[in-house]
Amino acid sequence: MLTTSDFKRGLVIKLDNSPCLILDVHFQSPSARGASTMVKTRYRNLLTGQVLDKTFRSGDKVEEADFERHKGQYLYADGDRGVFMDMETYEQFEMDAESFQVIQPYLLDGTEVVLGLFQERLVSVDPPQVVELTITDTPPVIKNATATAQTKEATLETGLTLQVPPYLEVGEKIKVDTRDCRFISRA
């Protein structure tokens, strides 16, 4: 059993028999004498994908979820589902279409990922924080645009579109932050 003092971002707890990933924790001190500290959490139910808020009293106990993280690899898209392989056991898992649609723009065949398993079932896939992708379509280079804060839209090899600096051309590899879909630099 865990107490609220153990809560931190990234911890997976069990609420209503579902694994829930803690996204944010805020400890709120009492304003009146005798009141207890409140622990406000924002979490994602890993079975449904819902993001919810819940407030606990300091010292409340919760069960830690039977959640395991494994090194994995993205193999291929099977229709609208993704197929992943556990790098330790070579077991293959399919990810549902709704969850896969969110991370697919960051994945190329063979990309290493982190698989989240709950009761031997795939419930989450974390792509690398930074991926290298090739620009397949973007407007032509704008002359003398190196010192400006302008951006232009670029389409990458996975179909992802994002804003990039105006000096980038088709065929260039760039680094993309998968947490907020942001251009970082040339690869």
Swiss-Prot record:
Signal peptide: none annotated. The keyword DNA-binding does not apply. This is Elongation factor P 1. Pfam families: EFP (PF01132), EFP_N (PF08207), Elong-fact-P_C (PF09285). PROSITE patterns: EFP. Belongs to the elongation factor P family. GO terms for cellular component: cytoplasm. Pathway: Protein biosynthesis; polypeptide chain elongation. Keywords: Cytoplasm, Elongation factor, Protein biosynthesis. Involved in peptide bond synthesis. Stimulates efficient translation and peptide-bond synthesis on native or reconstituted 70S ribosomes in vitro. Probably functions indirectly by altering the affinity of the ribosome for aminoacyl-tRNA, thus increasing their reactivity as acceptors for peptidyl transferase. It is found in: Cytoplasm. NCBIfam families: efp, PRK00529.1, PRK14578.1. SUPFAM superfamilies: Nucleic acid-binding proteins (SSF50249), Translation proteins SH3-like domain (SSF50104). It comes from Geobacter sulfurreducens (strain ATCC 51573 / DSM 12127 / PCA). GO terms for biological process: peptide biosynthetic process. The gene is efp1.
